[in-house]
Amino acid sequence: MAGKTLYDKLWDAHEVKRRDDGSSLIYIDRHIIHEVTSPQAFEGLRLASRKPWRIDTNIATPDHNVPTTPERKGGIEAIVDQVSRLQVQTLDENCDEYGIVEFKMNDERQGIVHVISPEQGATLPGMTVVCGDSHTSTHGAFGALAHGIGTSEVEHVLATQCLVAKKMKNMLVRVEGELPAGVTAKDIVLAVIGKIGTAGGNGHAMEFAGSAIRELSMEGRMTICNMSIEAGARVGLVAVDDTTVNYVEGRPYAPKGEQWKQAVASWKGLVSDADAVFDTLVELDAAQIKPQVSWGTSPEMVLAVDQCVPDPAAEADLIKRGSIERALKYMGLSANQAITDIKLDRVFIGSCTNSRIEDLRAAAEIAKGRKVAANVKQALVVPGSGLVKAQAEREGLDKIFLEAGFEWREPGCSMCLAMNPDRLESGEHCASTSNRNFEGRQGAGGRTHLVSPAMAAAAAVTGHFIDVRELIQGSAA
């Protein structure tokens, strides 16, 4: 009998009942809640005269709609947009009514859901984790089975602590070798998406493995698992090792004392067996990965920074040719245009993909001693949580950014999506550390280019895309 994958082990440990239709009832350990997908779920509970089944498994924070400017210090009443204000207020009221732990807008622990749960130790190895947000795959970096759910499922988890789901296939993405200097976790996952496409992981749980993955910090692993959904996989996973355990130890929600020792002992088994069989295998050589830049309107439209935008005339497939033509038109780019010739109007460093302390350090290293280019109208740095912000300020990173001409903001989802005041104007090009470059994602008509934090900072100070390794080596100014 073949061994089990990590996904198999997590699934089996949480399968309550297998149903006749092939689906299963799965127990949920951690439910993370934000202001956008929860109001209808709570209202559904009331209409059915139900209450949350287990209060202690829920943790909440507002993130999508909160302003990142000083206006938030005035409280909910200071939020200008009426819908945003109502959603944040409703989350507060629902959590207060049911006694759910919430890090409210001006709590230092507030932040993006996929940043605050890991930093609190609320995401633990071996858990099932769900949230009404597709980037819940982030938490798979801890060897947890994590994925996004819809609003009706949010209500179902609140009411029953279970979900009905069908088991997925197993995919292994193996990245071996040593990453070149200046190449990051973001570049790995963009390269993976560029290789297999946004549908490549459909129907799969995607486990990332190999020497290059093992060398990543937890921040890097979270970045990679965060974007597994952009490769079509609802679930991204990394096996548990000492890096995982060391990150979790001592955090507020982490086990303590004898329970900690028992937990660590059980977590050590959260790896795929040596003889486990995967349905799909994808392999990359880390040494061959270069800094990546998305050029089009899908994350799979991505290239190394030293390449040129594709020419639709060179594409034999008529459907793909049409897709390239539409993307070029929307993005305002020309066939065969060098990536390094793309000029930027705005830069955004933040989001649940890249707003942790390691990300801010990488960007600050590039920004230090330099100035935001004259053609860049705005360069935003938005920490993923109040605790990340405080840590960055203790390290003086805020001063580096401010002296370089960046704006230093309060935590939130910010310009990742046009649901708050931080957004692009039509026709503007933005170097963004977020995860999606769909049409209108950052604002109607906005043109998004996905990059790593270091690449975003490099674009900010040069005004166009540049191989960040040139700045690291000091050969460009």
Swiss-Prot record:
Class of the enzyme per the UniProt entry, highest EC level: lyase
Family from the record: Belongs to the aconitase/IPM isomerase family. LeuC type 1 subfamily.
Organism of provenance: Pseudomonas entomophila (strain L48)
EC numbers for this chain: 4.2.1.33
InterPro entries according to UniProt: 3-IsopropMal_deHydase_lsu (IPR004430), Acnase/IPM_dHydase_lsu_aba_1/3 (IPR015931), Acoase/IPM_deHydtase_lsu_aba (IPR001030), Aconitase_4Fe-4S_BS (IPR018136), Aconitase_4Fe-4S_dom (IPR036008), IPM_dehydratase_rel_enz (IPR050067), IPMI_cat (IPR033941)
Function according to Swiss-Prot or TrEMBL: Catalyzes the isomerization between 2-isopropylmalate and 3-isopropylmalate, via the formation of 2-isopropylmaleate.
Keywords: 4Fe-4S, Amino-acid biosynthesis, Branched-chain amino acid biosynthesis, Iron, Iron-sulfur, Leucine biosynthesis, Lyase, Metal-binding
Binding note for cofactor: Binds 1 [4Fe-4S] cluster per subunit.
Top-level taxon of origin: Bacteria
Pathway: Amino-acid biosynthesis; L-leucine biosynthesis; L-leucine from 3-methyl-2-oxobutanoate: step 2/4
Biological-process GO terms, alphabetical: L-leucine biosynthetic process
Record-given protein name: 3-isopropylmalate dehydratase large subunit
Subunit structure: Heterodimer of LeuC and LeuD.
Keyword match Protein biosynthesis: no
PROSITE patterns named in the record: ACONITASE_1 (PS00450), ACONITASE_2 (PS01244)
Binding site for [4Fe-4S] cluster: 352, 413, 416
Swiss-Prot/TrEMBL cofactor(s): [4Fe-4S] cluster
Gene name per UniProt: leuC
Cross-referenced Pfam families: Aconitase
Chemical reaction(s) catalysed: (2R,3S)-3-isopropylmalate = (2S)-2-isopropylmalate
GO MF term list: 3-isopropylmalate dehydratase activity; 4 iron, 4 sulfur cluster binding; metal ion binding
